[in-house]
Amino acid sequence: MRPNETGARDLWAEEERIFAREGTLRLCGVDEAGAGPLAGAVFAAAVILPRGLVLPGLDDSKRLTERRREALFPLIQEKAVAWAVAWADEREIDEINILNARMLAMERAIAQLDPPSEFALIDGNCGRGISCPHETLVKGDSRSASIAAASILAKVSRDRLLRRLDEEHPEYGFAKHKGYGTQAHYEAIRKYGLLPEHRRSFLKNLEAK
């Protein structure tokens, strides 16, 4: 299926497969945003959608423009049975590593759902530390409506945080690179130094110099 920002995609096949196996239950999609950047928290979102809901333009957040993600963000919140956004901050990332921090953020998001989820469909191939019944789905953000919705909530929430950080520290260019390791970001770090929001475990070589 080709990405389509104006039409509607039916992304319910994976959820329906689970419903057929497990019975009708409250199923949440879970995804994270910001595993790779040099700065800021890693965010996760969990979303329970009404069964069969088709939102025009819903897709993997990476396939959508920033404008489209921002437009879908309140629509997902409005239509969802439940949704939650959580994170693990840069200190936690440095202490427990990024993989464990990703899973911690996901578990926190799932735990905040009200009503609670009875089954989680998690993007990727790792469900370590997830306490509720779950299944992982590689490239789930482009295959599952629930995960696609979660990917948008997580991405938009994190991008908003980085824009606020840019207002506090405009010399680093966070609004543009969103904390990723661009040449401009590395140059800013060399010129101005590390901020508390930088992930030291990602920047050991720079700290050593």
Where are these regions (language model features)?
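RNase H-like, Mg2+-dependent phosphodiesterase core
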Residues: 1-209
